[in-house]
Amino acid sequence: MPGGQTTPHTRLYVITQENCINCPAAKAVINEAIDDTDLSYEEIDLLNMDPDFEFQLLENQIFIASTPSIVLDKEGALQLLYSGKVPTVEEIQKVLRGN
């Protein structure tokens, strides 16, 4: 990633749902932000969420109220970065650099 490195075992989750008008833009931002890195992201449908992942969210006191929601997983510790908002590429890259 230009200008910094990411923490090992970092992953992003983009929580979406059908008819979400901002979800395609959020996925495009994430794709661009992690381009040229070893990071990946996983899209998760809010209404068909894996129960284990849902439990992880609850353990980390993360409640998804709107989509798109972007969750950072740093070695198992989940953090809600954005909910109902499409961040900029620069905002995502800054978070991933830890700034």
Residue spans of the language-model regions?
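Short amphipathic alpha-helix with an adjacent loop that forms part of the alpha/beta core around
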Residues: 55-61, 93-96
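Local sequence-structure signature of Cys/Sec-based thiol-disulfide redox active-site neighborhoods
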Residues: 2-37
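Structural micro-motif
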Residues: 60-71
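Thiol-based oxidoreductase modules, predominantly thioredoxin-like and allied folds used
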Residues: 39-54
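Non-catalytic, surface beta->alpha helical segment in thiol-disulfide oxidoreductase systems
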Residues: 71-99
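Non-catalytic interaction surface on structured domains
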Residues: 30, 39-40, 71-74
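Chalcogenol-based redox active-site neighborhoods
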Residues: 2, 24, 47, 60, ...
